Amino acid sequence: MKRKRRQDTKHAVYMLVNTNTNEAYVGITVCGNDVKNALKVRFQKHVRRAVTENKNWALCRSIRAHGAEAFVVLLVDIVRGRKPAHAYERDIINGDVPALNSH
């Protein structure tokens, strides 16, 4: 018999801040036990997408204009479960309206 998949995996809610413009982006990623590595890998994915996919999203434009070195990655919180993590992320985005959360 297959084990039931866990519904309460840990998610990191994070913020990317452009230190040149003080603009921010809020996102989430599954983090497991290695939060630091999960955030590093997720930021690398953002950078790779900005450079290779030529998306016209605010975050991608900012990464292309200022470079990855202009950004700092901040851990906002760790939330158990996908639905609560997404809800928490939406609450932050709707409350603060980060400039780089647009696509």
Per-region residue spans from a language model:
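Structure-specific nucleic-acid interaction/processing domains
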Residues: K2-H103
